[in-house]
Amino acid sequence: MLEAKSLRKATVPRSLLQHPSPGNVQSNRLALHVNDDNSSCWVYIASGCRIYKLEISMQDSLVNRGKESLLIPEQCEVMNSSLVNHCPHRSEIQSIALAETERSDCLILGSVDSYGHLIVSKLDNSGKDVDRLTFSALPRDCGVGEGGWAGICFSPSQWCMAAVARSFCKSIDVYDQDIHLQTIRTLWYPSSLCFMQTLCSGNDSSLLAVTEGCQLSIWDLRMKENGGCVHRICGSLGDIFYTVCSSSTNIAVGGADRTVTIYDPRRWSALSRWVHCSKYEITGLAFSSIDSDYVYVQGVDYEVLCGQWRDSKKVLSFRGDSNWLGFSKCANRDVLGGWCDSGSIFLADITKENYIQSTDGLSNGVPS
């Protein structure tokens, strides 16, 4: 079973950012990176046309629980904060994402604004300013028309490959660095996307999962027939999907029906449905990196919960203090971060229960 090692709450300094810009219902304006020594975590947040970074301690602390085992955060201070030396956008940033490269000392930061303008920069792994590598890409229509929600995701095997979704345009553009590879036309307004990590797709990351309206569509970037669409799954009519995520074996979707549905990509059949696990609409999902039988669920009502999707059993949860402006999970470990419009940042470090018990035993001189 998973347990929380720590849950911390920090506040964005007013001197750095006083009034964050409002975001879309999909909270994609936050990204996380834990330092190599696990002592602190860099939190990247986007507001308006700029990106900011904050360093928050990751030291273990006593986790307090309230009613119904709700985790109570411990107040902490922001260790460092600054404006990221990232080329500014011309319109409001809608989504940001971090990707790791072959080198262990650098990260890739990508951002996309409401017109689909993509900017990618290389960051120092220690949280220092941007390196010299920066490139940008515009959609084929040069971002004309009405702006709206836009999303970005990097390929897990090729950091240089990124997919950008634009809701109002019903399109997804795929890039290799600043080279436009192809455009996917969706039937409905896309609301979330991710490269699939399933075993059946191998390591080439050619499969892209997209939520559009009440449908989950699967696209093979190597195919031309049907525009590359290889499968469609329809949810409940009228219940919009807001989020999709993938593990090495399964894929999960959630949305307005407050239900997490897990699919087997080998047969495209539903393995499990965790019905009404959230009080309101689900706008964020992530499989646990420790045990993919667990899934993290973010709801509109400030709540974040973790549970076993096979048994529909909640094991832990915490709440923000206002609407989420950004929410994310680290790529290879169970560290969750959320940013509220009050300026509060919540940072949760999750691990296996037996790990906490073993470390407690060692600290008391008793072998586990």
Model-found features: residue ranges?
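Beta-propeller domains
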Residues: M1-Q18, D37-C87, Y115-S136
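Terminal intrinsically disordered, low-complexity extensions flanking WD-repeat/beta-propeller proteins
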Residues: L2-A31, D36-W42, Q59, D301-V304, ...
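Canonical WD40 repeat/beta-propeller blade segments in eukaryotic WD-repeat proteins
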Residues: N24-V34, P88-E100, R140-F154, T186-S201, ...
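A common structural microfeature
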Residues: S27-R29, S40-W42, G48-I51, I93, ...
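Structural hallmark of WD40 beta-propellers
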Residues: S39-Y44, R103-G110, Q158-V164, Q182, ...
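Short, flexible beta-strand-to-coil junctions
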Residues: A46-R50, V112-G116, A165-F168, E212-G213, ...
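Per-blade loop-tip surfaces of WD-repeat and WD-like beta-propellers in eukaryotic adaptors/scaffolds
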Residues: S57-N64, H117-A137, S167-S192, L199-S206, ...
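Alpha-solenoid helical-repeat scaffolds
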Residues: S91-R185
